[in-house]
Amino acid sequence: MIEDVQEVTRMWNEFFSEDQVSVGDLKSRFYDNEFVKPILPSYKETAFSLAASRGNPFFYESDEEGKGWILGAGFSNQREDLLNLINKQFEEFARRKIGRVYYSNMVPTYFLPGVDDARYPQLKLALLELGFKQVQRVISMESGLESAIPETRPINGMDVSAVRNTEKNDLLTFIGNNFPADWYYRAKEVLEHGISEQVVVARKLNKIVGYGMFSAGSGKEWYASGERFGPFGVLESERSNGIGSMILINLIRNMKKLKLKKAYFLWTDERATHIYKRFGFNISRTFVIMEKVLF
């Protein structure tokens, strides 16, 4: 089935008035993405719904059997049109043996983390009517990078700096052993196509214990230097030791050195916000992740 991507783009931009996309965005992230298997049609009457299951396996991501996603949905006139469209998509999910459907992002395809129920309350109401339940609230934050960088005390045996060419493979192994496949994918692309200042590595006694990065985050060259902050993580056994703060300081310094005007990220939880607030980040938006159990 060939879809009119321009029409879906028009419908998206009409509904998500504050979160515009281009035809190229929809093609690269959804319709022509090797990791995404769309459910078509994705629009009917006055409604659209970007529903999908996994296409090609996404690196070592293993916890996806029986899961499907809706990456964005909306309507212009009748909510009933959206309800009918998604109910039809539920039938195809069931045929694909998918019993749980999430309104959320689907790595590496990323539009929005979930439903911004402050900006688009009518979407959440429609999903609730379809039987979706809220399972998580996530937080987006941003910083103007104008705040002074807090001082931190040195940690014995700790070295934090931009990634070295000689340790790129070791870093990917570290990420693969400790963090989600999406983090591995993003780091791999930035290490191959970006610049060293985009990736900061923490080493304890010459062993990698944490890292962080930033990139453009979207567009054809999303891996280039830009304002999208993260991912950022520390080995679980080394957390609460000040390592995360040292990584953050180095990342912010590098972003300032590259003349970036702000830093933002789309997804964290309430518990993690305290460290970011120390470095000038403020909450910009919140999103709800929603789930529908089909069987």
Can you annotate each of these PLM segments?
Residues 19-65, 176-236:
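A conserved beta-strand-loop-helix scaffold within acyl/acetyltransferase catalytic domains
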Residues 78-156, 290-292:
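Acyl-donor-binding surface of acyltransferase catalytic domains
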Residues 1-36, 138-139, 150-184:
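Short amphipathic alpha-helix that is part of the acyltransferase structural core
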Residues 36-38, 136-140, 197, 284-289:
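Short hydrophobic/aromatic beta-strand or adjacent loop that forms the aromatic wall/cage
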Residues 61-64, 68-82, 107, 231-240:
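A short, internal acetyl-CoA/4′-phosphopantetheine-binding micro-motif in the GNAT/acyltransferase core
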Residues 48-55, 131, 136-139, 210, ...:
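A structural microfeature
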Residues 101-104, 229, 263-267:
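Conserved hydrophobic beta-strand within the GNAT/NAT acetyltransferase core sheet
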Residues 78-95, 231-234, 240-253, 257, ...:
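Conserved acetyl-CoA-binding loop-helix of GNAT-fold acetyltransferases
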